[in-house]
Amino acid sequence: NSKKVKFYKKDIKNLKKIKNLFRGIDLVFHLAALSDVVPSIEKPIDYLNTNIIGTVNVLESMRIYNVKKIIYSASSSCYGIPRKYPTNEKEVIDPKYPYAFSKNLGEQTIAHWAKIYKINFVSLRLFNVYGTRSRTNTAYGAALGVFLKQKLSNHPFTIIGDGKQKRDFIHVND
């Protein structure tokens, strides 16, 4: 509801349709992406086009209009199955799925652009984001959404494994 923030629903794969939105801005908070593991296995080209080519289009739009700051919503999935918890940013990058690969390559692309075009960036490798609009239709990643759906339909919670697994969660407001 802030008057300082404007939301535009555009396709980041189309440079011509997005580039003029970057005129006169100070900072890009890049949240646009396809996100989900299973569909990325079924349609990897869609994920690569949106998450990599789309990110290049965001960066090119920034370059055209001399925008020098970007916050990128990356993904903890770039670590694959981490060797230790908690997982910090120095852990080995080992993406296991096209989604994870595409988000990590987006992060690398921003780092590369930052060197060439003197852009300041922060990349947030988010773990299991949840909130009021959490998806309830997938078993992977969106555990809280699945649990909410089970609760609202009076079904028991489904635990896969021995119940001792640990996951990090972050609320969308954080």
What is the meaning of each model-derived region?
Residues 1-129, 173:
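N-terminal Rossmann-like NAD(P)+-binding domain of SDR-like oxidoreductases, especially those catalyzing
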Residues 85, 108-168, 172-174:
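NAD(P)-dependent short-chain dehydrogenase/reductase
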